[in-house]
Regions:
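A short alpha-helical cap/connector motif
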Residues: 1-136, 143
Length: 143
């Protein structure tokens, strides 16, 4: 078996076809991101979002930290898969994108997401000082 599995178009189609359907709000985020031109590349793919959802559902994940949220597609996707007592903290420094993400979370009636809008290094220090622990950390920030 190869050490690496390439994500071909056929494999990605299979993943999408055999995963949960996107919600209307997830679709709205994707459509909105299309209007952002080159910045759309900051969004994870549908298959990546569905992989994260599967990972959360199968691993008893209750507490997620996301570093870098863009317009909220990944955070919303993960939050939708969390149990009722789950929570997600999303860190991003971009005020404009964070406001847009919040509007999508509100539209989806998703209350498991807490946003912290400031540089991630500052937020991470505060979370460490507060002795916060997470089951899953998704790093999708500017690299």
């Amino acid at each position: 078996m190869p050490k690496k599995l390439d994500l071909t178009d056929n494999l990605e189609k299979y993943i999408i076809d055999h995963s949960d359907d996107l919600t209307d709000v997830q679709k709205e985020i994707l459509n909105y991101n299309l209007s952002l031109g080159d910045q759309k590349k900051l969004q994870i793919s549908i298959s990546q979002a569905q992989f994260l959802q599967t990972l959360i559902k199968t691993s008893n994940t209750k507490k997620v930290l996301e570093i870098g949220s863009f317009t909220g597609f990944s955070a919303l996707s993960m939050a939708l898969s969390l149990p009722d007592d789950g929570s997600l903290i999303s860190l991003d420094k971009n005020v404009e994108f964070s406001k847009k993400a919040k509007s999508f979370y509100n539209k989806a009636n998703e209350n498991k997401i807490t946003q912290i809008i400031k540089p991630a290094l500052e937020s991470l220090k505060e979370l460490e000082n507060a002795k916060q622990k997470f089951d899953l950390v998704f790093i999708d920030a500017d690299k």
